[in-house]
């Protein structure tokens, strides 16, 4: 065999590896973490992407067994299609998610976020104790399991698609350290896309904590109110009933809605909440945003 043949390995993979060794090395290209800046956000507010706040992802559903979604298209506005896998999430779980995201936004997205469980519970207005800690752990698992695809349009043209090519979870993952009673939570950096272009609602946290226990519909409507700057807001009752995942008869929904609007008036989120008939003869909820 000639010297030339001895100098080159017979395997193509071996030759490729030899070429790589003699080429100048390149520094690995890694993710550059970036902190998410949300104009107007402070300790007085919690932020939620508008497409999430307008959808039925979080809803004032009854306690107990939750509906399980498998590739379900959630109820939302016509400019967004949200496909969801996971259990139906409620308003208490919305509180947890908003608070975790509030802490995560202080760091580059993707970095581990330390969350003390007792501090988290107190911040969302709950007690501390074994029952609450178990509830929080179940919620962390539910939020980590929850997976969604968000597709948004503007004037009928594609505007945003998140979660189809790469999965998107409400929480990417977490680890609990019992010795420190602390969670280390990871948030997918793709959430930056859903908060982008100021497409987020600022929820007044102090007012949310003042909403009475059992008034989850009021909490859900507070999030909806925050998605629009319009001074007077109108929502068809049929649309609102579906958005709130309220499956009892309309007559019961009207009563519950009146109570929720009164609660939001009490904590000064809205004013002059009422149900009236529009020019098409359809019932709608109307209120002024404060």
Question: Where are each of the predicted segments found?
Answer:
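Charged, alpha-helix-forming regions
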Residues: 1-290
């Amino acid at each position: 065999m000639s010297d030339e043949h001895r100098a080159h390995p017979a395997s193509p993979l071996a030759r490729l590896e030899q070429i790589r060794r003699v080429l100048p090395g390149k520094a690995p290209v890694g993710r550059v973490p970036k902190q998410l800046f949300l104009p107007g956000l402070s300790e007085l507010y919690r932020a939620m992407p508008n497409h999430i706040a307008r959808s039925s992802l979080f809803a004032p559903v009854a306690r107990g067994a939750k509906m399980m979604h498998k590739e379900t298209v959630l109820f939302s506005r016509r400019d967004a299609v949200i496909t969801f896998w996971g259990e139906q999430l409620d308003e208490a779980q919305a509180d947890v998610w908003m608070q975790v995201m509030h802490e995560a936004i202080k760091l580059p997205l993707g970095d581990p976020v330390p969350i003390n469980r007792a501090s988290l519970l107190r911040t969302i207005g709950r007690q501390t104790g074994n029952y609450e800690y178990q509830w929080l752990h179940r919620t962390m698992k539910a939020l980590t399991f929850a997976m969604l695809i968000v597709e948004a349009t503007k004037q009928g043209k594609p505007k945003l698609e998140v979660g189809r090519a790469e999965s998107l979870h409400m929480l990417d993952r977490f680890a609990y350290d019992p010795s420190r009673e602390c969670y280390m939570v990871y948030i997918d950096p793709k959430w930056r896309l859903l908060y982008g272009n100021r497409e987020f609602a600022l929820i007044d946290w102090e007012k949310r904590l003042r909403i009475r226990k059992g008034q989850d519909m009021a909490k859900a409507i507070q999030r909806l109110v925050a998605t629009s700057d319009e001074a007077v807001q109108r929502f068809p009752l049929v649309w609102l009933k579906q958005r709130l995942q309220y499956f009892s008869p309309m007559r019961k929904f009207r009563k519950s809605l009146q109570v929720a609007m009164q609660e939001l008036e009490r904590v000064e989120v809205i004013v002059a909440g009422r149900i009236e008939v529009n020019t098409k003869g359809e019932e709608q909820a109307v209120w002024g945003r404060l």
